[in-house]
Swiss-Prot record:
Restricts trafficking of FAF2 from the endoplasmic reticulum to lipid droplets. May negatively regulate the canonical Wnt signaling pathway in the lymphocytes. This is Ubiquitin-associated domain-containing protein 2. The keyword Metal-binding does not apply. PROSITE patterns: UBA.
Amino acid sequence: MFTSTGSNGLYKAPLSKSLLLVPSAISILLTLLFQHYQKFFAYNLQAIKEDFQIWRLVCGRVICLDLKDTFCSSLLIYNFRIFERRYGSRKFSSFLLGAWTLSALFDLLLVEAAQYVFGITINSLPSGFLGPVFALFVPFYCSIPRVQVTQVLGYFSITNKTLVYILGLQLLTSGSYIWILALSGLISGICYNSSILKVHRILCVPSWVAKIFSWTLEPIFSSAEPTNEIRVGMGATVDIQRQQRMELLDRQIMMSQVAQMRRQRQQQGGMINWNRLFPPLRHRHNENYQDHHPSDQDTPPPTEVSEEQVARLMEMGFSRGDALEALRASNNDLNVATNFLLQH
């Protein structure tokens, strides 16, 4: 996965692990062995409205009856486990509870709106825990920094978030009316993430409930700390931990900028400089913003590089050109430049 979600695995993410294992196992059993029980997990809106089978709002919105939806939603939950590590299990479960409740309301409203505006009668929707999964795209888009990983054809950027969006698009196109679940999930995610009408205070998991689950279920779904990864020191306070996380993301962004500089240098070393013939969109945007004034005059002078640091990198076996690029991009930070050169 391209997403920067900390350590691999499900360490410090017991709720995400339970959402991966339990619904997926039930979905596989219903598909392979107990097909005659699938009717109890169908998201039948007609039965809810006409026969007042309110229990279908619960059963029909937890277990996926399509294995493709199970697979895609499981991958997305695995990527979104970063929010449980960041917020804690209680706050993460409160977000899922609020998004799940609000999306149930928006499902019914959107179905009625589709029938009133477009004349489309929708009697059933895809089953599964899909509303909260789509709702998690809201904090993912707002709070996870975009770090470039590579480029395709020199213009299409592949970032640490690209694969997650592709999975969301695959899930969106897996059913005919799943767009209603996606739209209701996004709306509920916006409402909860923006604290509209203080829903985060109303739809939350009480502390005593969180303690009960932490005593009973958390030991079952907790994962051991990865032993094959380099241990990173953790600050004693939340502010220090947040600062450490921001420093790590700054280093990732800086390294992606260095990689972009190296690719541009390789492109300019070819027979045709395609950047001069077809400038990237961000350069065109800057030119339009500056009213087509030449940008060469406003370009800041390059950062002066210490020859002593260049010599130290060359002693390690790196070329002078690579050492200069890494030091310029890292503002003469020898450690960051060395880490980048060792990884590329």
